[in-house]
Amino acid sequence: MATKLAYRGSEPTKFKKTKIKKDDEVLVISGKEKGKKGKVLAVDKRKDRVYIEGVNKRKRFVRPTQENPGGGAIEIEFPIHISNVMFHDAKAENKAKPKKKIKAVRLGFAKKDGKSVRVTRPEGKEV
């Protein structure tokens, strides 16, 4: 008796090492929210998604409860795929020339004193 395997789309990646962490300042580089900056509220490593403060907000309708007796619509942040955001380095943007603004930088890992730390690439400055 052969069992039929169902295709469930892209399987979630477990225990993936992400370069974006909570409380980082990031810039959205693609999608309908392109160009917006915000602070990372949470990282969902299982689904490769990030929640960013003030970005990708949607309305949800809630029933009246004791905490919210009126009920109604509330706006909450929805996740964005981690490939659509880049780390934003405010220090580098302030030092840049006015014509050439540095919006986002790539992150990498480097060994310092036996520990793995996040650094900007290609400069190698520790974050």
Swiss-Prot record:
Q: Which NCBIfam families match?
A: rplX_bact
Q: Member of which family?
A: Belongs to the universal ribosomal protein uL24 family.
**Protein task:** One of two assembly initiator proteins, it binds directly to the 5'-end of the 23S rRNA, where it nucleates assembly of the 50S subunit.
Under the subunit heading, UniProt states: Part of the 50S ribosomal subunit.
Which keywords accompany this UniProt record?
Answer: Ribonucleoprotein, Ribosomal protein, RNA-binding, rRNA-binding
User: What is the name of the protein in this document?
Assistant: Large ribosomal subunit protein uL24
State the GO CC annotations. Answer: ribonucleoprotein complex; ribosome
Gene3D superfamilies attached to this UniProt entry: 2.30.30.30
Q: What is the lineage of its organism?
A: Bacteria, Pseudomonadati, Spirochaetota, Spirochaetia, Leptospirales
Instruction: Tell me the InterPro entries matching this sequence.
Output: KOW, Rib_uL2_dom2, Ribosomal_uL24, Ribosomal_uL24_CS, Ribosomal_uL24_KOW, Translation_prot_SH3-like_sf
The cross-references to CDD domains, in alphabetical order and at most eight, read:
KOW_RPL26
Question: Which BP terms from GO are recorded?
Answer: translation
- What is the gene called? rplX
Q: Which organism does this sequence originate in?
A: Leptospira biflexa serovar Patoc (strain Patoc 1 / ATCC 23582 / Paris)
What does the record give under GO molecular function?
Answer: rRNA binding; structural constituent of ribosome
**A single Pfam family, by name?**
KOW
